[in-house]
């Protein structure tokens, strides 16, 4: 595991350390559209409060095995509110290629910094860990690696190949970055070992991309999934959206229509929760009735499965989502 220094406070130019893992204000002080906090923080409504149960033996077992294997999970790095439930149930979303992202998205709690070199042992270590945990369904995601010529696609393939060698019955979902400028090369590489589910999150409405997803492009992300589907029509494609960043209901519905127009099969929609006072603020809490409306509209549009609700995250109950969609 990386022992890199973690910096949270904004740094001056002379004190800036690109090798450090930057979090919170340190990460977001250099984004093009600065985060503007609203006057009063919205109070969390009752329906989005996570019921924190006592950590189970399985929870501690997974954490110990992850540390012993030098592996990261997005559950921990992104401060997911569902970590207790998922770890307790023996599921985790593994984050490969390090814990420092080359992007600085102000909704995300994953650290930013100059990435470390790829760990050539990670694919086998990951496969051994999954076999040890006897997992039947795994999600593999990664930080953005704009420093790599293939965006990290070969590392995904190496992980998938190793997992299938040691756990041939385990189903694999990958949650990939956008492979900015390298999508055709990445898709060609992924042909060697396509996943059971291909996931890439659109995150929000296109109007909010400059603020929420600096360095990303809405149409580019849609095209990535459409291109993958054309190459692998038998593999379900999936994408997720957050609500609460300042979008309207109609904008969410339009994103859903755009997804279907680009052959995306599965959908997740969840409430955005701000990781810190330095991140984008929550601009609205969406009522359960509105989530229900989104879910009903999703099935009318033809999605094979839609997981919609305040605490839904892209990887939350991913196995149940996939099985409900026929995977």
From Swiss-Prot:
PROSITE patterns per UniProt: RADICAL_SAM
Sequence positions that bind [4Fe-4S] cluster 1: 75, 80, 86, 315
Superkingdom, natural source: Bacteria
Main localization, broad class: cytoplasm
A GO CC term assigned to this protein in UniProt: cytoplasm
Pfam families per record: LIAS_N (PF16881), Radical_SAM (PF04055)
Keyword annotations: 4Fe-4S, Cytoplasm, Iron, Iron-sulfur, Metal-binding, S-adenosyl-L-methionine, Transferase
Catalytic activity, as annotated: [[Fe-S] cluster scaffold protein carrying a second [4Fe-4S](2+) cluster] + N(6)-octanoyl-L-lysyl-[protein] + 2 oxidized [2Fe-2S]-[ferredoxin] + 2 S-adenosyl-L-methionine + 4 H(+) = [[Fe-S] cluster scaffold protein] + N(6)-[(R)-dihydrolipoyl]-L-lysyl-[protein] + 4 Fe(3+) + 2 hydrogen sulfide + 2 5'-deoxyadenosine + 2 L-methionine + 2 reduced [2Fe-2S]-[ferredoxin]
Binding site for [4Fe-4S] cluster 2: 101, 105, 108
Pathway participation: Protein modification; protein lipoylation via endogenous pathway; protein N(6)-(lipoyl)lysine from octanoyl-[acyl-carrier-protein]: step 2/2
Cofactor note: Binds 2 [4Fe-4S] clusters per subunit. One cluster is coordinated with 3 cysteines and an exchangeable S-adenosyl-L-methionine.
Limits of the Radical SAM core domain: 87-304
EC number: 2.8.1.8
NCBIfam families: lipA, PRK05481.1, PRK12928.1
Family: Belongs to the radical SAM superfamily. Lipoyl synthase family.
Protein's UniProt name: Lipoyl synthase
The gene coding this protein: lipA
